[in-house]
Amino acid sequence: MNEKATVIETDVLVVGSGPAGAASTLLLATYGVKTLCVSKYATTSRTPRSHITNQRTMEVMRDLGLELECEAMASPAELMGENVYCTSLVGDELGRVLTWGTHPQRRADYELASPTHMCDLPQNLLEPIMINHAARRGADVRFHTEFVSLKQDETGVTATVRDHLLDRQYDIRAKYLIGADGANSQVVDQVGLPMEGKMGVSGSINVVFEADLTKYVGHRPSVLYWVIQPGSSVGGLGIGVIRMVRPWNKWLCIWGYDIAGGPPDLNEAHARQIVHSLLGDSTIPVKIESTSTWTVNDMYATRLFDNRVFCMGDAVHRHPPTNGLGSNTSIQDAFNLCWKLSHVLQGKAGPELLATYNEERAPVARQVVQRANKSLGDFPPILAALGLFDTKDPEQMQRNIARLKEQSPEAQEQRAALRAAIDGTQYVYNAHGVEMNQRYQSAAIVPDGTPDPGFRRDSELYHAHSGRPGAPVPHVWVTRHGRRVSTLDLCGKGRFSLLSGIAGSPWVEAAVHAAESLGIDLDVHIIGPGQELEDLYGDFARVREIEESGALLVRPDNFICWRAMRWQEGSGDELRAALKRVLSVH
């Protein structure tokens, strides 16, 4: 069958069902937007691929009511942190570093930053959670359906897709289209988004396998075991990796190849050889599940939209897996855009609001690509300290590594250099600020004219709360009827929120008038003694950066978009004016 079927109409067409596409479909369905998601594949991802799930992403899952379901499928933080460098899994250990906030000195930073926790949730487990709930909440999800082309006009987008089950093409008419179709995005290519950087910097091999490795890792639980041996510096990440998928019997190993020679022939014998080499024991029973190749990329889009087409995820930020930023950034792209789309489609905001997606997320795309690629540069000093760059002879490399055990002055210098190099990987594994410190500047943020004090500590390593417009609303624990409630739980869920102290009761009436006049949902929370919400720990007073009668206006994506230092005559009008500005209502 080749004839085109009747045109299908929807409000938003999402191309791709990976982390960005699945999150967009779920968020839009949750907000009541008519949404259709298409994927050329038969199902969600079959391979684990991305896995590190940071607190910002878990906050999105919490907002959607899915945090507990995600935690039930994930490996918790306590099984993630003993990051090991070794000559093979059964061989000599060269050093360890505590990662993902598990070091006692960093644990408090993570606990103070968010009500959620870091976890390891492989992509093949997270995607079905999001897609299943998207469908339950009303989204139309179609697999075996490949995006072919699109045309835009003043009122919408017409996309042609191919149904591979029926072998026919048909058109979908949408008011907006989201391109979340991965690093080889057809949507990005067709609308011609400008890209910077390069693809195919180096080549990598993934081998997913099953093996009971409890004996070797149960006492040093980690997500990543980095294997340094002759040949590990060729291609890939510059180092071999054994990655936990499910503790402690399912794994993914990464090995590089010379991209100039093209992808290798990955038969089962070759895959088994790679796995056993990294394990260091060819007698360990191994079941090869799948193999694949991929390339390290260093590319991002400088503009994320074209008229009614918005792109996100790997389509617009393409980078290596270092720092675990890929799926996290993709899901947060969706969290930024989807409330804006829902407000525009429901007549609560002007279409100009949608341009702020680009203003706010394009800098993030650039940041994560640059950080992930910069982190690759943190591994060569480890190899250099081991003397692996001093020779091309594999036997000499082994002797250089073995020198660590000697008691000579040269060996002492080598041990010090190795420890310093391993400690230098903090920006790879504990870059809490990269994950959490986004600050937005756009037409959907109303600055208050006060000078920005900047960050007190390293903004890549450490998270910092802020009450300034453009910052995420700070998480602290307040109480309702004696039970702890996060300030984040007072916000989000597709609605605007206003937070104030005990002297902020005038904001209640002002918010009602503003919300009614603009047709939006706006919740008001007064926090203080004798109120339904109390600040018994005093933390809200410490982080809000406003007076007791002031207010923080929080967008549906939990970012502060306006603040008033205090209530005064005319504050109600200022609130309404701020909302109109944020929503691009004229």
UniProtKB/Swiss-Prot annotation:
GO terms, molecular function: 2,4-dichlorophenol 6-monooxygenase activity; FAD binding
One BP term from GO: 2,4-dichlorophenoxyacetic acid catabolic process
Enzyme Commission number(s): 1.14.13.20
Enzyme class: oxidoreductase
Residues that hold FAD according to the record: 11-40, 304-314
Protein role: Transforms 2,4-dichlorophenol (2,4-DCP) into 3,5-dichlorocatechol.
Protein's name according to its UniProt entry: 2,4-dichlorophenol 6-monooxygenase
Organism, scientific name: Delftia acidovorans (Pseudomonas acidovorans)
